[in-house]
Amino acid sequence: MLDAFSRVVVNSDSKAAYVSGSDLQALKTFINDGNKRLDAVNYIVSNSSCIVSDAISGMICENPGLITPGGNCYTNRRMAACLRDGEIILRYVSYALLAGDASVLEDRCLNGLKETYIALGVPTNSTVRAVSIMKAAAVCFISNTASQRKVEVIEGDCSALASEVASYCDRVVAAVS
């Protein structure tokens, strides 16, 4: 946020002028878009438990073998690890959305994730499915189309933010595939 403000100040200072006109309008647009971004992150964060548990439940419904003896979600400890991993992935997706940049997701979450899952015997196709379900839910919350829960939204189109969060989820899918 400071970068946008700093750019405007530096630009105005180089002209020996007050911040006004198009620079002021650019800041207003930035602030309005920033509020939408904060709201989008808040929608994900305030619904994260629901998003993750629904994704894991959906993954298990489609592959019931995961909760049978020998399955990767069999025993409470493994189920808890699966839910924890879903929470971590969604948390880093929300960080990327907040920053408007995928580097935090790439560096701190995805780097080495596939190799770790392979070493632990985690089926990547199940992870891909869970992330796909989380993606659909996050997009619904951001675009305010979630069927069971509507939220107060800032006026304006949030489709760009919905697309952005979808792209971060797609990065997760690509990283573990």
Curated annotation (Swiss-Prot):
Pfam families cross-referenced by the UniProt entry: Phycobilisome (PF00502)
Chief location bin: plastid
GO biological process terms on file: photosynthesis
Residue positions binding phycourobilin: 50, 54, 61, 147-148
Keyword Electron transport among UniProt keywords: yes
Post-translational events: Contains two covalently linked phycoerythrobilin chromophores and one covalently linked phycourobilin chromophore. In the PDB entry, the bilins are named as phycocyanobilins although the modeled compounds correspond to phycoerythrobilins.
Binding site for (2R,3E)-phycoerythrobilin 2: 35, 39, 158
List of residues binding (2R,3E)-phycoerythrobilin 1: 72, 77-78, 82, 84-85
Signal peptide span: none
CDD domains attached to this UniProt entry: PE_beta-like
A GO CC annotation given for this chain: chloroplast thylakoid membrane
Entry membrane topology: Peripheral membrane protein
Record carries keyword Thylakoid: yes
Modified residues (N4-methylasparagine): 72
Keywords attached to this entry: Antenna complex, Bile pigment, Chloroplast, Chromophore, Electron transport, Membrane, Methylation, Photosynthesis, Phycobilisome, Plastid, Thylakoid, Transport
Coiled coil regions, renumbered to chain: none
Compartments, as annotated in UniProt: Plastid, Chloroplast thylakoid membrane
Record-stated family: Belongs to the phycobiliprotein family.
Protein's job: Light-harvesting photosynthetic tetrapyrrole chromophore-protein from the phycobiliprotein complex.
Extra remark: The light-harvesting antenna system in red algae and cyanobacteria is formed of phycobilisomes. These are composed of the phycobiliproteins phycoerythrin (CPE), phycocyanin (CPC) and allophycocyanin (APC). Cyanobacteria also contain phycoerythrocyanin (PCC). The phycobiliproteins all share the same subunit composition and organization with variations in the covalently bound open-chain tetrapyrrole chromophores.
Oligomeric and partner information: Heterododecamer of 6 alpha and 6 beta chains. The basic functional unit of phycobiliproteins is a ring-shaped hexamer formed from two back-to-back trimers contacting via the alpha chain subunits. The trimers are composed of alpha/beta subunit heterodimers arranged around a three-fold axis of symmetry. The phycoerythrins also contain a gamma subunit which is located in the center of the hexamer.
PANTHER family: C-PHYCOCYANIN BETA SUBUNIT, PHYCOBILISOME 32.1 KDA LINKER POLYPEPTIDE, PHYCOCYANIN-ASSOCIATED, ROD 2-RELATED
Name of the protein this chain belongs to: R-phycoerythrin beta chain
